[in-house]
Regions:
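A mature extracytoplasmic/lumenal domain signature
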Residues: 48-50, 57-59, 105, 118-120, ...
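N-terminal helix-cap/turn-to-beta initiation motif at the start of protein domains
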Residues: 20-30
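Short aromatic-glycine motifs in intrinsically disordered, low-complexity regions
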Residues: 75, 126-134
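Central antiparallel beta-sheet cores of small beta-barrel/beta-sandwich binding domains
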Residues: 40-113
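Positively charged n-region of N-terminal signal peptides that target proteins for export
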Residues: 1-5
């Protein structure tokens, strides 16, 4: 009887681990960002390149604004548009989360450490943007996966149209 209970517990544990295991590429695709300081919601694509994950915005859900990177610390880049700017970068997948990345905040022109976790249902990601590597001093940013019915409204950019932060 004791062996049966142990076998059932092991099976239950393994089932739960496998059922909720995340694939590294689960975050790729189109997302709605959290609203910015002007209440614009970006359409963002997360993609994989050389085993790291990156994100750029290319449209707004609720606006046709063309927005420049006016707070970039490099003055010569302030007239460039945010469209196509890779502002979440170098994320590495390990132990069910994406970490060791950076995220640029165009509202203040600063770059922060970034760690990403995916919700159990795969419809939401939480980005922890922090000034310290441990994520203690920072804030959470929530992005929502685009519903499949809305994906055809948007056309991602070609990789040749993207630009790195600096």
């Amino acid at each position: 009887m004791k062996n049966k209970i142990i076998a059932i517990l092991i099976f239950t544990f393994l089932f739960n681990v496998l059922a909720f295991a995340q694939n590294a590429d689960d975050i790729t695709g189109l997302w709605y960002s959290q609203a910015d300081s002007k209440n614009r919601i970006s359409v963002v694509e997360i993609y994989k390149e050389n085993n790291k994950y990156y994100a750029y915005s290319f449209a707004y859900k609720n606006s046709n604004d063309i927005v420049n990177d006016v707070n970039n610390p490099k003055k010569e880049l302030r007239n460039l548009p945010l469209k196509g700017l890779v502002y979440l970068y170098d994320l590495e997948f390990s132990n069910g989360e994406w970490k060791n990345g950076k995220i640029y905040n165009p509202d203040d022109g600063k770059t922060y450490n970034a760690k990403v976790t995916l919700s159990d249902n795969g419809r939401e990601i939480k980005i922890r943007a922090s000034v310290d590597g441990a994520g203690i001093f920072g804030k959470n940013i929530i992005w929502q996966k685009l519903p499949s019915s809305e994906v055809p409204k948007y056309k991602s950019l070609n990789k040749s149209e993207l630009r790195k932060l600096n």
